[in-house]
């Protein structure tokens, strides 16, 4: 399997960037793993073979296998379609935070853990998501809520633990959701702006997608997180539901 590049965008009107007479192309993001798995029929094949669970991880983190047995056990006992390993995260830290998003619900950091446990028992619905929110979006999202921003709780950490892209999927559910959606994960753009008005790009940007956005392909299926320590160490230079272990 090989990921294809996508055309780069030169401005807010999404005009295609051209360099030296050729369309400029960039990677589409690791969310393409879902489309590639579906295109090659692998989740459906694995489900027919009786395989139940799939682990996805990034090779910049050498420690994910420390968590594998525990996160598999949690995934089975909770009936999760996707389970994310999460780590303690400081407020404002440049790591995505895993949150329970409930439309129309206020966010109260003093009640977040209780809400997450209630959500586990209730199960996910089409209006609720346990999902990663990127750090540059998390604080602005929370500023308009009673939380007032991404602030520490009594532990000194953010109530929204860090996503490290160690993800366990239930193969049967994954195959069904990818068959329904074609494995197409919702896309976004994250341009570097050249002006305060955010009207010009510093350089061409790209449409991209992320593998941890799989919960956005799910309705009714339960997606959660397992909070763990000492399962994350970068091998490169760095530039909701809750179960404690």
Where in this protein do the model-derived segments appear?
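Conserved N-terminal catalytic core of the sugar/cofactor nucleotidyltransferase
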Residues: 1-51
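Catalytic core of tubulin tyrosine ligase-like
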Residues: 46-58, 63-67, 72-245
